Structures are given as structure tokens and as C-alpha cells.
Amino acid sequence: MKREFLPILLSMVMFVCACSEPSVEGPEQVDNPNNTEQEDPNNGEDNKEEAKCQAGEYYKSGLAEGIIAYVDETGEHGLLISLDEGYTQWSTDYIMLVVQGGEFSREDGARNTAYIKSQENWEDLYPAVVWCNGKNALGLSSWYLPAPGELAKAAQHVDAINATLESMGYDVIATGVNESYWSSEEFGVQGAYAISMASGDFADYGHDKKAYNRVRAMRKF
């Protein structure tokens, strides 16, 4: 009788130990014998806040890599500004562009850039656009010369952007009194708008197209 009882007792001990062994992965489990759905007291708001992007953060997804310059009201989309910059002319000649269907956009640099790239010999005539377009790969047109309004949005967060650039070893965005960045909006035959990243302001008269200014590319994400 004792010999028959011993194997049964051992099997019971092994079963209890296996069921009560703590999990080595994941958080501690809360008893929920009815397997009912647990209500989230925060309604998921904490997780949503953590997932939102912020201006000044480094961003990389696929071929998109840069610093977040602006975030829209969703917290998930906005504008990236390039990690590096160029120094070049807006145009090598005084030619006034006539935009088909209206004027240059104050807020949509991608549209402005696409129009400039549609011009004959654009690669010889528009060095600032060429520099920005050089960041595109696989035939894409994601990077562009930003519009004045897009640069102005980035200027609002220039301190946060520069802090990240500096921590990564890149040149910061210049904010000196006489430092400006080319936008993609033309101003007459001889001018184009250039933006002060210290204030986001731009001269009403534009800058000489043949003059040299700084250039940063932007793209949407």
C-alpha cells in the first residue's frame, strides 16, 4: 500500500510546483479568474502621450533621417530638417519663374521645389534645389528646399534642434544676425526669400539670387 501511495504523492508535489512557478518574462500577473477585460483607468492616454513626437528629437525611419523641426496637431506627423547643410546660390542667373496655376507657395516647399525641377536646365540654374535634391535616393523626391513658412516653423524650435545636432556631432543651425537660409520661394527676377533662423523672419525685398546663403533640406514624415 505504501509503495502505491508514494508515486501518487510525488506526482501531486510536482504538479503544484509547476503551477506556482513565477514567470521569468513580463510584468507580474494580476489574478483575473473570470478572464474578463480589465478597464484602463487612464483610457490609454499615458501611452498616447509617450508615443507623440517632439520637435528637436532625432528621427530615423527607412530612408528618412533628420531632426524633427515641427510636429502637427496629431503628434505623429510633421517636418524633418537635414542633419547637415550647404552654402550656395539660389540661382546662377536672373530668371523669373512663372508658376503654373498660381504663385509660389509660402507653406509648401515640396510644391515649389517640384516646379523648379520642372524647368529646363534646372540642375545648372538652381544650386540650392540641387543640393537638397541630392539627399533623395531611389528616384524619390522626399527632400526639398523648404518654403519660408516651413523654415519659420523650424525657427520656433531652433534651440531644441541645435541641442540634438550638437550632441550628435553635427554643425548647428546658424542664428547669427547676418545668417540666413534659402527658401524655395522666388521674389521677382533677381531675388528669393531667405529666412533668419533666429527669428523666423524674412526680408520683404528678398535676397539676391546669385548671393550665397546657407541651405537645409526638409521633408515630411
What are these regions (language model features)?
Residues M1-C17:
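Sec-dependent bacterial lipoprotein signal peptides
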